[in-house]
Design a protein with these regions (language model features):
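Alpha-helical transmembrane segments in eukaryotic/viral proteins
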Residues: 8-40
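Blade-level signature of beta-propeller repeat domains, shared across WD40, Kelch, NHL, RCC1
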Residues: 420-425, 434-470
Length: 470
């Protein structure tokens, strides 16, 4: 067979295969149209499948047309009841890891927001990690100068707990450089504070929609908790501060229902200072452990009743839990007054367990490094120094930062008590490290019925990044 005959033969075979392929497609389409509709579905040529995910964001409605899926996103129906949250806190023996986002490690090559002030709050179906972005990404030129607390670019966003604060999964919540958020059982309420220092405004959102506002009443950096607010039987409570950070300021507790403010009370605390309260529900009341940025190395305690009456003082324990602080042996606790003569401070938390108290603190007495949680016998009601448990979460060779509280609702755990949980922020970058940026990741721990070994769940990112070397 000469070369021309070979070419003709190969071409003929190829043409035949093409024709056969076309005929097979025609037969396939004919069978699909004529036969399949009559096969047990009464001539219908589509099928709708509802796929409901454990999210508050969306439900997928998938309509199948032959071999094509048409996906619509439909709003999840509102729950028909509020969370109760009047149960007591569960007694716990230790705290086990719940999640770790590793945001800075991932952000060296991923699209991760520059953040600070992360916190966690839970609905009946999920827990979400909230954070204040700087309107910029890690390892990008816009991360320069993000050590600054307040700017028009800061926003409150959230992801499912454990996810990094990345651009692909984050949900916008509010424009904010100070914030809080909580779920009443039906919808999320978020509060974002933004605007100029002298005339800041807190915008209340409910179900993603702005529903109310609070204007600055003292004209000096209106600010709120930087952790979860607290909802009890459909009414949600939070604490705000307006005034100086290093002397007497003004403090208020607020109550809202479905995003509308229905009550507020001024908290009288002469000689004391309250900022950045970490609050949780316990036996029908809101218990808060806060930050004294003026003089005390002990932490203010605020207990709010549903009618907005309150009791305010200091954590009684004979061990200090703010930073900076002096030696434990030289500290004398007080239930009513600031002690320790230490200015500045850091956001922290505590949990009441009967008369005992779990209290978190940095391991370092002078800087935001390391983190441990102590249980002090009778520390809620007496100046006790008796440590009955201690657990290390971040060792003192690694940076920590803010910390705060939240609880797992009974709808999630199926228990008859509220599980106490806390998160620890791990700040990286400026001012302690040679970078152009400041950001953080977090570790989240929840109470369990077992003792947990000490370990260090530190941030672990290797700095500086490429952007810092330019």
């Amino acid at each position: 067979m000469n070369p021309n005959q070979k070419i003709i033969t190969i071409g003929s075979i190829s043409l035949g295969l093409v024709v056969l392929n076309i005929l097979l497609h025609i037969v396939s389409i004919t069978i699909t149209v004529l036969v399949l509709p009559g096969n047990g579905n009464n001539g219908s040529c589509n099928e709708t499948v509802i796929r409901e995910y454990n999210e508050t964001v969306r439900v997928e409605k998938v309509t199948q047309w032959h071999n094509t899926n048409v996906i619509e996103y439909i709003e999840r129906p509102e729950s028909d009841h509020f969370m109760n949250n009047t149960e007591p806190l569960c007694d716990v023996k230790g705290f086990a890891p719940f999640s770790k986002d590793n945001g800075i490690r991932i952000g060296s090559r991923g699209h991760v927001f520059v953040i600070r002030e992360p916190f966690v709050s839970c609905s009946p179906t999920e827990c979400r990690a909230f954070f204040l972005t700087q309107g910029s990404l890690l390892n990008d030129k816009h991360s320069n100068g993000t050590v600054k607390d307040r700017s028009p670019y800061r926003t409150l966003m959230s992801v499912e707990v454990g996810q990094s604060p990345n651009v692909y999964q984050a949900r916008f919540e509010a424009v904010a450089w100070s914030a809080t958020a909580c779920h009443d059982g039906k919808r999320w309420m978020t509060i974002g504070v933004t605007g100029p220092d002298a005339k800041a405004v807190a915008v209340v959102h409910y179900g993603g929609i702005p529903t109310d506002v609070i204007n600055s009443w003292a004209g000096d950096i209106l600010r709120t908790q930087e952790s979860s607010c607290t909802c009890i039987q459909g009414e949600c409570y939070w604490v705000m501060t307006d005034g100086p950070a290093n002397r007497q300021a003004q403090y208020k507790a607020f109550k809202a229902k479905q995003g509308k403010i229905i009550g507020q009370t001024e908290i009288s605390f002469n000689g004391g200072h309250i900022e950045e309260c970490s609050c949780y529900p316990n036996e029908g009341k809101v218990e808060c452990v806060c930050r004294d940025n003026w003089t005390g190395a002990n932490r203010p305690v605020l207990v709010i009743s549903p009618d907005l009456s309150y009791r305010v003082g200091y954590l009684c324990a004979g061990l200090p839990s703010d930073t900076p602080r002096g030696e434990d042996s030289q500290f004398t606790g007080s239930c009513t007054s600031p002690m320790g003569n230490q200015g500045y401070g850091v956001k922290g938390f505590g949990f009441r367990q009967g008369n005992d108290v779990w209290m978190g603190r940095t391991i370092s007495r002078t800087s935001r490094s390391g983190f441990e949680i102590l249980k002090v016998r009778n520390g809620w009601v007496q100046n006790s120094k008796e440590q009955i448990k201690k657990q290390v979460v971040v060792d003192n060779l690694n940076w920590s930062g803010y910390s705060g509280s939240f609880t797992l609702p009974v709808e999630l755990t199926k228990r008859n008590c509220l599980v106490p949980c806390f998160w620890v922020e791990m700040i990286r970058g400026k001012p302690e490290e040679k970078t152009i940026w400041t950001s953080s990741s977090s570790i989240v721990m929840c109470g369990v019925d077992h003792e947990i070994a000490d370990w260090s769940w530190h941030d672990g990112a290797i700095l500086p990044f490429d952007i810092d070397k330019m």
